Amino acid sequence: MKAIIVTDRTAGLAGMTLTERPEPSAAINDVIVQIHASGFVPTEMEWPSTWTDRRNLDRTPSIPGHELAGVVTALGYGTTGLSVGQRVFGLADWHRDGTLAEYVAIEARNLAPLPGDVDFTVGASLPISGLTAWQGLFQHGRLQAGQSVLAHGAAGAV
């Protein structure tokens, strides 16, 4: 499969290379998604998770990108709630290969069904901004049921 990889932390965006990589395989509770649209922010190049795994071991060459929309092509052992051929969107794990590729292996819990009337590019643009808004309202703002919110100047992605 084609994928954009990074290998040199100091090269920044100039260090991104389009290359051939093996297609991922689905582990337990994983889903393989054929990517139709993907999101990427340049600051990912500064995140430790782009370069290391959860044990802080080097994982380069790595594939950046976290937001995605696409179609399920395979299910790992024990995966439930999704089916092959289903349209989905979601967030890839920060410490695994990302979404700047033709396929990604992702935990099923990080995906949601994408309605048929929602374009893949729209679906891929929602996860980070939606999560950021949710965290702002509920985790940081401690919003409770029945409370009101004024969204002043709500013109950005969040």
Feature annotation, model-predicted:
Residues L57, G90-G153:
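NAD(P)H dinucleotide-binding glycine-rich loop of Rossmann-like/cofactor-binding domains
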Residues G12-L18, D53-R54, L131-T132:
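Short gly/ser/thr-rich secondary-structure transition/capping motifs
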Residues P22-F40, T52-H95:
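Glycine-rich beta-strand-centered segment in the early N-terminal region that forms part
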Residues L18-E23, A69-V71, Y103-A105, L111:
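Conserved hydrophobic/aromatic beta-strand scaffold that supports enzyme active sites
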Residues T43-S49:
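Cytochrome P450 core scaffold surrounding the K-helix E-X-X-R motif
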Residues A157:
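NAD(P)H-binding Rossmann-fold N-terminus in SDR/SDR-like oxidoreductases
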